[in-house]
Design a protein with these regions (language model features):
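Short, flexible active-site loop motifs that bind/organize anionic cofactors or intermediates
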Residues: 9-10, 109
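Hydrophobic faces of well-ordered beta-strands that scaffold small-molecule active sites
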Residues: 6-9, 35-38, 65-69, 92-94, ...
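N-terminal targeting peptides
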Residues: 1-3
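Aromatic- and acidic-residue-enriched carbohydrate-binding clefts of CAZyme catalytic domains
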Residues: 113-114
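Conserved radical SAM core fold
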Residues: 39-46, 73-74, 97-110, 172
Length: 172
């Protein structure tokens, strides 16, 4: 018996809930273990955009979908609480792997890897949050092995090893 898991990564603007549900119906047939949603980027208003609301609404997700958070600050924890309280998710994925120039320039996605102290503070805030602990919320991270060089990986991995992450995904 294989322990292989198959996940479908998101592509912003393409892999919304309609795509994920149709893909699973016609191709996945239950063979995909998780479908990652396009990232949600918390904002100052503490509200989701209409398209984000449609995408994260459990009524629109007939399959095992996982919300992805992209941030550069632990202030996004309100987003996680809303995802769990209002939509019933029990896992979030922190995106520390997106290589897009516009994302990296805001120190989000793989841009977080340039400052491992901040990355550690963010993970600490998430993992020590009472709500997340009390409700046994799983936290996974999508990352790269470095922002400039693969030699950065050891320092990055040292940060991740300090936390009980559900999974760590390496973005190629």
């Amino acid at each position: 018996m294989s322990n292989t898991k198959v996940y479908l990564a998101p592509m912003e603007g393409l892999t919304d809930y309609m795509f994920r549900n149709a893909f699973d119906e016609f191709f996945g047939h239950g063979k995909i273990d998780k479908y990652f949603m396009p990232f949600i980027s918390p904002n100052q208003t503490e509200k989701f955009l209409a398209k984000e609301m449609r995408d994260i609404d459990r009524n629109n997700n007939l399959i095992n979908s996982l919300p992805q958070i992209m941030t550069n600050t632990p202030d996004f924890i309100w987003t996680a609480h809303m995802l769990f309280d209002n939509f019933g998710y029990n896992e979030i994925n922190l995106n520390a792997g997106c290589p897009s120039g516009t994302v990296v320039s805001k120190s989000k996605g793989s841009g977080m890897l340039a400052d491992t102290d901040r990355l550690e503070r963010i993970l600490y805030e998430i993992m020590s949050d009472n709500y997340i602990q009390d409700n046994n919320i799983k936290v996974s991270v999508k990352t790269r092995i470095g922002i400039e060089s693969p030699d950065e990986w050891y320092n990055i991995l040292e940060v991740y090893n300090k936390f009980s992450l559900e999974e760590l995904f390496i973005h190629p």
